[in-house]
Regions:
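Short coil turns that delineate tetratricopeptide repeat
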Residues: 1, 33, 67, 101, ...
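TPR/TPR-like (Sel1-like) alpha-helical repeat modules
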Residues: 98, 183-205, 214
Length: 321
């Protein structure tokens, strides 16, 4: 039989287009229709080629012919969802649950589909069952808390977030979910308090922290109203990442926005000795000294900058002033 040859060609990428892969997989399956691997690979090839209607038919057959494989139910449900048939997707997942019991990946799909179809109460029931099955998993409490939040049951949502934090008070996913909850309720003091915890975590990328701080400070009125909390956030970053250029600029910018020019100037001067030298810091020092009308200091730092960056025209212009 040529079936293995066609299968190997398709499986090893020996084709020019996804449609050609489908044809190779189809030939392998047609030559040996009893081989479930050929059948599944044919369905996968159709999905990769974006031929979802045909893939749906294949996975319907696979579910019937091989009902003991939960992955067939997962993919069939995903295809129904892609076809905007969430009810059929839920029926498929219910069938899987009856046959296999609760499988985390299928339960997650089911909850998401229940939320998408506005069946929040049913999604809550699913999440409660998950929590009861594994009460010491923080993420399970977070999921249930998120669903309570969607249902506007805030006290129950907070209780679940609290339980998650009791299990692991530093879990970033839990803290992010709690921050989103407070943001949705416009409880900004609570949001900033949780954000401070996030800023103290090494697990949250610095880039994300900087982006969040920028979002908070982009609104001048918000900046004024919550200045002390935002100052605390900026200070937290400055302490944790004292030598990161992005944080130096963030903290200096915060000091300047706060009217603390002398402190910003002192911060930049500390970093003039950094290696390799950063022309941005020299430029900032010269600009602030110029604004403060310290001509002797301007000349001093322009001279130092030119020694390090002789090709930079703007430093020559500064010396000219």
């Amino acid at each position: 039989t040529y079936a293995p040859a066609y299968y190997e060609l398709a499986a090893n990428g020996m084709y020019a287009t996804p449609d050609e892969a489908v044809e190779l997989a189809r030939k392998a399956f047609r030559l040996d229709t009893t081989n479930k691997w050929y059948h599944q690979f044919y369905g996968q090839a159709l999905i990769y080629a974006g031929r979802y209607d045909e893939a749906l038919k294949v996975y319907r057959r696979l579910q019937t012919e091989n009902p003991k494989d939960p992955d067939n139910y997962r993919i069939l449900a995903a295809l129904y969802e892609q076809k905007q048939s969430p009810v059929m997707a839920l029926v498929t997942l219910d069938s899987a649950e009856l046959r296999f019991g609760r499988i985390p990946v299928l339960s997650a799909m089911k909850r998401r589909l229940l939320v998408a179809t506005n069946q929040i109460d049913k999604a809550v029931v699913e999440a409660r069952a998950m929590v009861e099955a594994a009460p010491y998993e923080a993420q399970h409490h977070v999921i249930l808390g998120d669903l309570y939040a969607i249902a506007k049951k805030d006290s129950l949502a907070r209780a679940e977030y609290d339980r998650a934090l009791q299990i692991d008070s530093t879990n970033v996913q839990t803290l992010m979910a709690l921050a989103d909850f407070h943001a949705g309720r416009q409880d900004y003091r609570a949001l900033l308090a949780v954000t401070r915890q996030l800023f103290q975590s090494d697990e949250l990328p610095l880039e994300t922290k900087i982006k969040r701080f920028g979002q908070f400070t982009s609104d001048t009125r918000f900046y004024r109203e919550y200045y002390f909390q935002l100052n605390d956030l900026a200070s937290t970053l400055a302490i944790r990442y004292p030598d990161d250029k992005r944080v130096v600029e963030l903290y200096a910018g915060h000091l300047i926005a706060s009217g603390e020019l002398e402190q910003a100037l002192a911060l930049y001067k500390i970093h003039l000795a950094d290696q390799p030298p950063a022309e941005e810091y020299f430029r900032a020092v010269i600009d602030i000294e110029s604004y403060l009308q310290h001509p002797d200091s301007v000349d001093k730092y322009v001279t130092r900058a030119l020694e390090l960056f002789p090709a930079k025209v703007d430093f020559h212009l500064s010396k000219g002033h």
